[in-house]
Design a protein with these regions (language model features):
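Helical hinge/lid and interdomain linker segments adjacent to catalytic or ligand-binding clefts
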Residues: 444-524, 628-652
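Glycan-recognition surfaces in beta-rich domains, encompassing non-catalytic CBMs
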Residues: 657-812
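Active-site-adjacent "subsite" loops/lids of carbohydrate-active enzymes
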Residues: 42-45, 49-50, 106-110, 117-118, ...
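Aromatic-lined carbohydrate-binding/catalytic grooves of carbohydrate-active enzymes
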Residues: 65-116, 144-152, 220-230, 462, ...
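Hydrophobic targeting/anchoring helices
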Residues: 22, 27, 216, 222-223, ...
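Catalytic domains of carbohydrate-active enzymes, especially glycoside hydrolases
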Residues: 52-98, 203-213, 283, 288, ...
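Carbohydrate-binding surface patches
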Residues: 423-451, 483-489, 565-610, 646-652
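Aromatic-lined carbohydrate-recognition surfaces of secreted/lumenal glycan-active proteins
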Residues: 38-40, 133-144, 214-216, 234-273, ...
Length: 812
């Protein structure tokens, strides 16, 4: 279909937007959300506190603007506990900070008084920008060391804190003779670590003005994909609880910020007995950060193994929202700020599609209450404002990156807070069942991890954006298609609601082993049952998931709901906000080395979305370009969408016709004349149609004659390509420089530590397709464009090649 061509050019066309043009929001528009931004203490200077704070807000303040939720900064004082654990209580003493094993990258010396002045200056500077009640928190990672880059004095003093590498809160500390704020004469022998650290943290926050503690990666058990012995996880959870109780008792106003360590939310409870709901409902947790990694980890590490796929992280978020619903705890997914994170992940940020995609995915993941009311997450936690993790300790992320991320986050959040409908599947979380399994089924393989299986279906083209609690099941909050996981230990009222729903024609799906399904919920009408093979929680590639996804699509089709025509990997969440239907299409990949472009066929139900008759088209959210129309009056609108690997776009569904479609001519079209020794490459993964023509021989040319008002030449820029001359109707009009070294782009400059990772990532993922030349406003009639290999190149280029992928003919 022609839709394919125009959608392809939408993908190519918005590269210009992603390279610097940003959406400007009206001052009257506000994102109804919290926004916390992480920054390494390395950025701030004790000998120039005011200057470094002013520089921070001068650069980063736009990210806090137009936000009417909570605003704050989370300072990273070297990951380890040292700053607080070794706190003497004397503001004139030097604070203990971890040391780097890497020379020349050490923290400055800070006294308690200087750190207090830093906190005070941050708050006063924030108020000058109109950010009242601005919060300052610190985080700790909790391990004995990290990446072999930081060494902890606390670990040297008290290695018994880490009996099995992981922190053990209830570890009895050995007596010592050091001076501490709460024990001036040394820690008494046998003092539990949780008690000592809670008292130290309370004293430190009072003395310095710190408002919160983020328990980064030491909030939940560190084996998030395993089932530890029950006594281990019980000991860990009770230690965390005891710490929070003691901390809140000593410092009630201190914000306690949890952090889930990138593990599955069901795994925390079912596998390890970590009951975040109990903590939050007892006011021990104020915020909960979902380590959803909005670029880093998601692509580079093989996502089917490391559970870092886009779908997996969205599923984790959805389950966490259901876990913490009805509490006061604020849920904040983590999104990376382009260029700000970390040693071997900094290269992954070249494609801003990923930043945009993650922000929209997470902002528009909803929890459905008993009455069916939808609520999004409470905001974002952003990492990092500075580039210390990318080995640039004296630089902040760029103005361009700030501007881009602000526009993205604000727009996504505003769409979320006007939500009226979340289409597709709805995951029903079963807290009682997970608690029972944790206490009674330890040592059993974790095949019932609901977030894993939910993400299987999302990966395979089943639209899903929401979650709910199984005990709240009703026709009001069932959504388009309820998915129930391990439905046993379910209240009788909910069972009755489920039975009634299916008897009256509602379709549902039940996932779980036979012994995890209540007998009253077996053999229901209009129900798909799936008993997924047990797995260790690390391998996503369930062989029968595709068959199940096909069954669901068939149910959708039969029910007059939106569906995907062919079974392909990919996400396409849909929701309705302020009367507008949104769609996001993501080309998910299981393995980087097999990454390919895809064409998705998405079928949209007029009835489901409340659409009228007549033509509809997709419209890009950021450039308002009309793309791909369906001119039929059928009940189902059909759109074909081209998406490169690991990419996505966000659009709305609008009534009316699209403008005349451009025509894409692939490089294999017989109307293109090749002269010389051109090679045909059929493995060009990110090219249109996954192929291209290549030549490095001087004088070789490709010539194309067309009729239209303009034309664009699509090709590749890379580190092995040289110059080509462009001729239009016999006249030289342009010289293309095909050289590009993506590893030197500002957004992905990183240390030598990352070199091998960077090369692999660029090889498979970085989109190299470029508009090499474009012209418009041509006279009516026939025109000829010719691309000639010059046999010359930049000194840095490794070869003289020229690549031709396609020609876009403009018909208007």
């Amino acid at each position: 279909m022609k839709t394919r061509w125009l959608l392809f050019f939408f993908i190519i066309g918005i590269y210009g937007i992603l390279k610097g043009q940003n959406l400007n929001l009206s001052n009257s528009e506000q994102a109804l959300e919290d926004r916390w931004i992480e920054c390494d203490l390395l950025w701030f200077k004790p000998n120039d506190i005011r200057g470094s704070v002013d520089d921070y807000f001068s650069r980063i303040s736009p990210l806090y603007g137009n936000i009417n939720g909570e605003k704050g900064i989370v300072l990273n004082p070297g990951w380890m506990f040292d700053m607080v654990a070794c706190w003497t209580g004397n503001l004139d003493d030097q604070l203990i900070l971890p040391t780097f094993s890497m020379p020349g990258h050490q923290y400055s010396s800070w006294t308690g008084k200087e750190f207090r002045e830093l906190v005070k200056t941050i708050k006063s500077s924030a108020s000058k920008y109109g950010f009242n009640d601005f919060k300052v928190a610190i985080w700790f990672w909790g391990g004995p060391q990290l990446y072999d880059l930081e060494k902890s004095e606390w670990k040297d003093r008290h290695p018994e804190t880490y009996p099995v590498y992981n922190l053990r809160y209830q570890s009895p500390l050995k007596g010592d003779k050091y001076t501490y704020a709460v024990y001036p004469n040394g820690i008494p022998n046998g003092t539990p670590f949780y008690s000592f650290f809670a008292k130290q943290m309370a004293d430190f926050s009072k003395a310095t003005g710190i408002d919160g503690l983020e328990m980064r990666d030491f909030m939940t058990f560190r084996h998030s994909y395993e089932v530890p012995p029950h006594e281990w996880d019980e000991d860990f959870y009770q230690g965390v609880r005891s710490f929070l109780v003691e901390l809140k008792k000593a410092r009630p106003s201190l914000l306690c910020i949890g952090y889930n360590s990138a593990g599955p939310a069901t795994g925390d409870l079912r596998g390890q007995g970590f009951d975040s709901y109990s903590l939050a409902s007892n006011y021990l947790l104020d915020h909960y950060v979902i380590e959803s990694w909005g670029v880093a980890w998601n692509d580079f590490y093989k996502p089917h193994i490391f559970s870092c796929s886009y779908a997996a992280q969205q599923a984790y978020l959805a389950v966490t929202q259901a876990q913490l619903a009805e509490t006061k705890c604020r849920v904040l997914p983590l999104v990376e700020l382009t260029g700000g994170w970390e040693y071997d992940d900094a290269p992954l940020t070249r494609s801003r599609f990923n930043n945009r995609m993650q922000a929209w995915l997470y902002a528009n993941t909803f929890y459905a209450s008993r009455a069916g009311d939808l609520s999004p997450p409470n905001g974002f936690s952003l990492a990092f404002a500075d580039r210390a993790r990318a080995m640039e300790k004296n630089s902040l992320i760029s103005e361009d990156q700030v501007s881009f991320m602000k526009a993205t986050l604000d727009r996504a959040s505003m769409a979320a807070h006007g939500v009226e409908k979340a289409y597709g599947c709805r995951l029903f979380y079963n807290r009682n069942g997970l608690l029972w399994m944790n206490k009674n089924a330890q040592g059993v393989d974790l095949g019932e991890y609901s977030d894993f299986h939910f993400s299987f279906l999302m990966n395979l083209g089943i639209t899903a954006t929401s979650s709910a609690r199984i005990e709240d099941f009703s026709k009001e909050n069932a959504g388009d298609f309820p998915i129930l996981f391990t439905p046993f230990q379910v209240p009788d009222k909910a069972i009755s609601q489920i039975q009634d729903y299916t008897k009256k024609g509602g379709s549902i799906m039940i996932i779980g082993a036979k012994n995890t399904i209540d007998p009253k919920l077996k053999n229901l009408p209009n129900t798909i049952y799936w008993e997924p093979p047990l797995n260790d929680g690390k391998n996503f590639a369930n062989p029968d998931a595709a068959e199940i996804a096909t069954k669901i699509n068939n149910v959708f089709k039969a029910s007059g709901l939106s569906f995907q025509s062919t079974q392909q990997l990919g996400l396409w969440p849909m929701w309705k906000s302020k009367g507008v239907n949104y769609m996001q299409i993501v080309n998910f990949q299981y393995q980087i080395e097999n990454a390919v472009s895809r064409v998705y066929t998405i079928n949209i139900s007029r009835k489901q979305l409340g659409l009228g008759s007549g033509p509809y088209h997709l419209e890009g959210v950021y450039d308002q370009r009309k793309i791909g129309a369906d001119y039929t009056d059928k009940d189902i609108l059909s759109f074909r969408v081209f998406v490169p690997p690991f990419e996505s776009f966000i659009c709305t569904l609008q009534p009316g016709e699209a403008p005349p479609e451009n025509t894409l001519i692939n490089n294999t079209d017989p109307r293109i004349v090749y002269k010389g020794d051109w090679k045909h490459n059929e493995m060009a993964l990110v090219s249109f149609n996954q192929d291209e023509h290549f030549s490095a021989n001087k004088g070789d040319y490709a010539k194309f004659t067309f009729t239209g008002s303009g034309v664009s030449v699509l090709g590749t820029k890379s580190d092995n390509l040289g110059y080509a001359d462009i001729f239009l109707d016999g006249k030289k009009v342009y010289t293309v420089d095909g050289f590009a070294d993506w590893s030197k782009e500002p957004s992905i400059i990183t240390s030598a530590h990352s070199t091998n990772f960077l090369k692999d990532y660029l090889k498979y993922v970085v989109p190299e397709k470029q508009v090499l030349y474009t012209v418009s406003g041509l006279s009516k009639g026939s025109h000829t464009i010719k691309i000639v290999v010059t046999g010359t190149k930049q000194a840095e280029a490794s070869d003289y090649g020229v690549v031709v992928d396609a020609f876009e003919v403009k018909n208007h």
